[in-house]
A protein has these predicted regions:
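Conserved SAM-binding loop of SAM-dependent methyltransferases across substrates and taxa
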Residues: 58-70
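Conserved class I S-adenosyl-L-methionine
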Residues: 49-58, 73-76
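Core SAM-dependent methyltransferase catalytic element
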Residues: 262-287
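A short glycine-rich, Lys/Arg-flanked "PGG" loop and its adjoining helix->strand segment in the class I
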Residues: 221-240
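A short acidic, Gly/Pro-enriched loop at the edge of an enzyme's catalytic core
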Residues: 49-50, 193-208
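S-adenosyl-L-methionine
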Residues: 1-48
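Conserved beta-strand signature within the Rossmann-like core of class I S-adenosyl-L-methionine
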Residues: 207, 240-249
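Class I S-adenosyl-L-methionine-dependent methyltransferase module
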Residues: 2-14, 25-26, 81-181
Length: 287
């Protein structure tokens, strides 16, 4: 009998089990192993005692928030692989010291494998740091991989750059490792348009990566209407003085000009001068 993890990995779920995507992101796309954003652009503010919502993606936004003192993180993504990739990476950080962690990540990038071989089975090594659901997913993945039913890049996309993360430095990695002992991430399978229906709290900080860039793909009426719906939905779960952070790889969208008239947000941005292309981080602060 095929279990739910095989159905997930083999993309056999029925339409009723799939999450409607408001953007072009899919339910079963390979999940980024690393961010492709310059995380150093984000402000280094103290996030202790803040309610935080992040996009899941590679897990790096949640990890960056934890590095800056955040401890209670809600994380959402329409991609149902993202939470498992994030959880595995976090388990490895908890298990391994700085050099051992990045040595294993080099194996991943060079061999396109999680190094499930005779030298070490990473999943068994980090099992105590995975919950039951996460362990069963990765155990099923390995079973299917050995039997040539799935491949590494069906689940994980090694595109990105670990050096763009603040925790790529030993001092920050060790701080993150300590902070993870008191941190909790709750994952939601949700698209951005539905997240306000799936959570039961309000947030001080929201980190959306480049999701809004996809929502506001052009300044045509259709996309502007979508953008206004998304921001209006997020506004319902934001506390006074909260901030939404986003990333823009094209530096063309008008995030402040297309705001609904009944909403009041202050817009700010910082460009990445060393990226070689136009990229920026922007913030929408609730006034």
């Amino acid at each position: 009998m095929i279990n739910k993890y095989e159905k997930l990995l083999l993309n056999m779920n029925s339409n009723k089990d799939k999450i409607t995507s408001f953007t072009s992101f899919g339910n079963f796309d390979p999940s980024y192993l690393w961010t492709n954003e310059d995380m150093k652009l984000y402000p280094k503010e103290n996030l202790k005692d803040k309610n935080i919502l992040t996009i899941t993606s590679s897990g790096d936004h949640a990890l960056n928030a934890i590095l800056n003192g955040g401890s209670i993180i809600d994380s959402f993504d329409v991609n149902q692989f993202s939470k498992y990739v994030s959880a595995l990476k976090i388990a490895m950080i908890k298990k391994y010291d700085y050099y051992d962690f990045f040595k294993r990540m080099d194996w991943i990038e060079n061999v396109e494998s999680l190094n499930f071989n005779s030298r070490e089975n990473i999943i068994d090594s980090v099992r105590k740091y995975l919950n039951h659901d996460e362990y069963l997913f990765w155990s099923t993945f390995e079973y299917l991989r050995i039997n040539n039913k799935v491949h590494f890049n069906d689940v994980i996309n090694v595109y990105g750059n670990l050096k763009k993360n603040v925790y790529s430095k030993a001092l920050s990695y060790n701080k993150l490792k300590r902070n993870l002992k008191n941190a909790k991430i709750t994952y939601y399978d949700s698209d951005i348009i539905d997240i306000e229906k799936n959570v039961n709290k309000k947030y001080d900080r929201v980190f959306l990566s480049n999701v809004l860039e996809y929502v506001l793909a052009t300044n045509t009426p259709h996309f502007v209407d979508n953008y206004q719906k998304v921001i209006s939905g997020l506004d319902k779960i934001l506390l006074p003085g909260s901030v939404i952070y986003g990333y823009d790889f094209s530096n063309v969208s008008k995030y402040s000009d297309n705001m609904s008239e009944h909403l009041s947000y202050k817009y700010d941005e910082a460009s990445c001068k060393s990226c070689g292309v136009q990229q920026k981080i922007f913030s929408l602060s609730k006034v």
